[in-house]
Amino acid sequence: KSMIYLNDAKDTNGPFQLVKNSNSFFNAIKTSINLNKTYPNTRFTNEDVEKISQSKNLQTLTGKAGTLIFFDPSLIHRGAPLLSSERYAITNYYDSEHNYYNSIEKIPPECRF
């Protein structure tokens, strides 16, 4: 998955956050048990993320407009709570199993950059 900030993302306007190493199978099971959730539960509330981040490494990714972030969507992630202003971003999902184009050569010329 990727995301591009369309305006500056600061600590106060909901920057992207992720819990480091939360995508491993062992950590996912441990997190589910600690939160009394049935595994695999892929949805976490802001309260859940706050609890998780107290014992793990919550990473906040601030950046200027145009910043591109690539990340594994199986990581526990969110937009931080808004304290002021707004944060705009475009997200993109990629699924290699259902990818329409298998290689760059098959993309029509009018769609290339």
Predicted regions and their residues:
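Compositionally biased, intrinsically disordered low-complexity regions enriched in proline and serine
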Residues: L6, P40, T45, A89, ...
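Short, conserved beta-strand element in jelly-roll/cupin
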Residues: K1-D11, T62-A65, F70, Y93-E97
